[in-house]
Amino acid sequence: MTKGLYTAYTGMINQMHRMDVLTNNLANSATNGFKKEGATSQAFDEVLAVKIKDTSDYGIPKGLGGVSLGVKIGETYTDYAQGPFRVTDNKFDFALDGDGFFAISFTNKAGESSVKYTRDGAFTLTKEGYLVTKDGDFVLNKDAALASDGNSAGGVPGGAIQLNPNLDFKVDEEGRIIQDGEEVATLGVVDIEDYNYIKKYGENLYDLQEGGVVTDSTAKVRQETLEMSNVNVVYEMVEMITTTRAYETNQKVIQAIDDSLSKAANDVGRV
């Protein structure tokens, strides 16, 4: 019976984690280029198989019987499916039709620069003509993006895209920027060979992990268009209701076991 308490407890912890993921998805349902996340869990037999190598601590006594207790939180994964497009008629807005990312030179609060990747193509132009993100980070050109190892871009702002702010420009599907009839730069659109080597950094950016390989992208660039989030609000809300009910069910299990233990200790003990 006591094992049932821990089984229900781990179930509640798992549902809390799933709720956090769902809440984050809903909060970013209107974020340009946002990719939804999902949460997995491990069943009893899977937990038992890896238990001997498991160093994580979930506050569950390991010595309670020979069978693993409850469910363990698995990995949180990212769904990279394409989001819908929205035409903006803003020449500084870009969307990628296919797999790939825009490479940018990101500067953190400590003033340290590194290359990050994003699907959010809502850019703007500085008075000096540099193409930047809404947060002021340089958008890299193709050469700098491909040469990057995720730590540096080899000479930003030399690797940044600089246009003549007094002239109009067009961008073709290959990302080539045409100004006054000449190609002046190419958007740094790249892909990652294995998506297991990138993770969300925050601020709608992705970070390349050690061992990750940057490759050229086959995605087509759409100017005056933005990719929206791939979050389905209705689906996420249904999942949230399901998760809430699962959490409440585990609560009721704990309450029922607690009542039974109380009765065994108090009522039966008096007989």
Which residue stretches match the model-derived regions?
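Amphipathic alpha-helical polymerization modules
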Residues: 1-271
